[in-house]
Amino acid sequence: MLWRLVQQWSVAVFLLSYSVPSCGRSVEELGRRLKRAVSEHQLLHDKGKSIQDLRRRFFLHHLIAEIHTAEIRATSEVSPNSKPAPNTKNHPVRFGSDDEGKYLTQETNKVETYKEQPLKTPGKKKKSKPGKRKEQEKKKRRTRSAWLTSYVAGTGLEEDYLSDISATSLELNSRRH
């Protein structure tokens, strides 16, 4: 019995280890066929995807062809209780009076054409001294605070501050012109 078991095992090992041609190919070639490069896998994947896309396009084209060639139903065969289609409603041509468009908030029917403003020519910018603005702001603050203190305190300093303010306003006006 042991001898018979050894014979069966040896035949099985021999058959498994020996490359027997299958359909005209050896077992090694069949094994190589299963081992594909990444580029081959990508190619097959892309090919399958394109075939699936083509089938989808044919299917959609077939559906669209059915939609476009569908028979148009006659509108005279409408049941008495059904609602009319939204595009068959009879709306009046004009909704308001004739002078409705004349009194718009925005004037859209102007006879005059739009006149373009002349473009400003770029000129030299005036260079100012860096501390000049700060000095002017300080003067303004002084005059404001002086007005408040003189108003609250009731001292007779209003005249001095008025003359100071008029002097600064004259300076500003002369610089602007």
From Swiss-Prot:
GO terms for biological process: adenylate cyclase-activating G protein-coupled receptor signaling pathway; bone mineralization; osteoblast development; regulation of chondrocyte differentiation. Neuroendocrine peptide which is a critical regulator of cellular and organ growth, development, migration, differentiation and survival and of epithelial calcium ion transport. Acts by binding to its receptor, PTH1R, activating G protein-coupled receptor signaling. Regulates endochondral bone development and epithelial-mesenchymal interactions during the formation of the mammary glands and teeth. Required for skeletal homeostasis. Promotes mammary mesenchyme differentiation and bud outgrowth by modulating mesenchymal cell responsiveness to BMPs. There are several secretory forms, including osteostatin, arising from endoproteolytic cleavage of the initial translation product. Each of these secretory forms is believed to have one or more of its own receptors that mediates the normal paracrine, autocrine and endocrine actions. Belongs to the parathyroid hormone family. GO terms for molecular function: hormone activity; peptide hormone receptor binding. This is Parathyroid hormone-related protein. Residues 109-118 have a biased composition (Basic and acidic residues). Keywords: Calcium, Cleavage on pair of basic residues, Cytoplasm, Hormone, Nucleus, Secreted, Signal. Residues 1-24 form the signal peptide. Residues 74-149 are annotated as: Disordered. Its main location: secreted. Residues 122-132 have a biased composition (Basic residues). PTHrP interacts with PTH1R (via N-terminal extracellular domain). It is found in: Secreted; Cytoplasm; Nucleus. A motif (Nuclear localization signal) lies at residues 108-129. Residues 57-68 are annotated as: Important for receptor binding.
